[in-house]
Amino acid sequence: MTDLSTLRFFRTPAHGCSYLEDRQASTLFVDPQAALSPELYSELSLLGFRRSGDYLYRPHCDSCNACIPARVRVDDFLPRRRHRRILKHNADLTVHREPARFSRELYTLYAAYINDRHGDGDMYPPSEEQFTNFLTCEWADTHFYGFREKGKLLAVAVTDQLNDGLSAVYTFFDPTLPERSLGVMALLWQIEQCQRLRLPYLYLGYWIRQCQKMSYKNQYQPLEILASGSWKEQSEPNDSGD
């Protein structure tokens, strides 16, 4: 186990929040010169850290704690009716482990996704450099899982393996196929992959109740959140019964 007290951290200046309007955000980064490894990553994930490229980070805002680390306890996960329908609809897809690096095929799908879904965000416009710097990593145990229909790439789940689970880093997919709900399908597959690997958790990143783009994560129960320094089960009512 790493002595975390020896690590150095760097905090960014305050800047506009990407998720909540009229709020200021700040991010805490692990010293990029530190000897980062999957083991250290696993330890820091228990404290709410995530990976972006070769960096480990977590929100560290002065006046806001809306970004709450979340993970699914996969052994107790029960898919909803909607989840079962989505899995059935995508049963024709095959899953392949792609090389975790830039390729023209992967980037073409990524760019189409960013252009369609994030044209008004700070990830637009996409670039090859952005793809590489955001998704690939020199030291992490990173996997690109590609979902294909008769050889055609429809979705990619960028997934990191940790000591106690998988971390769902990012998913991008063909935006012209909304009927497939490819983002949901990829997350459900990652839950199943945790079960196959006998890993107890799928780390989802940050749950933000007030942000529609991030609040969907409470659809995957049982969901645990990191609050006051410990992981606790978080439950949301499901009025739709779906």
Curated annotation (Swiss-Prot):
Signal peptide: none annotated. It catalyses: N-terminal L-glutamyl-[protein] + L-leucyl-tRNA(Leu) = N-terminal L-leucyl-L-glutamyl-[protein] + tRNA(Leu) + H(+); N-terminal L-aspartyl-[protein] + L-leucyl-tRNA(Leu) = N-terminal L-leucyl-L-aspartyl-[protein] + tRNA(Leu) + H(+). One of its GO terms (cellular component) is cytoplasm. It is an enzyme of class 2 (transferase). Its main location: cytoplasm. It is found in: Cytoplasm. GO terms for molecular function: arginyl-tRNA--protein transferase activity; leucyl-tRNA--protein transferase activity. Its EC number is 2.3.2.29. One of its GO terms (biological process) is ubiquitin-dependent protein catabolic process via the N-end rule pathway. Keywords: Acyltransferase, Cytoplasm, Transferase. Pfam families: ATE_C, ATE_N. Functions in the N-end rule pathway of protein degradation where it conjugates Leu from its aminoacyl-tRNA to the N-termini of proteins containing an N-terminal aspartate or glutamate. NCBIfam families: PRK01305.1-1 (NF002341), PRK01305.1-3 (NF002342), PRK01305.2-2 (NF002345), PRK01305.2-3 (NF002346). Belongs to the R-transferase family. Bpt subfamily. This is Aspartate/glutamate leucyltransferase. It comes from Alcanivorax borkumensis (strain ATCC 700651 / DSM 11573 / NCIMB 13689 / SK2). The gene is bpt.
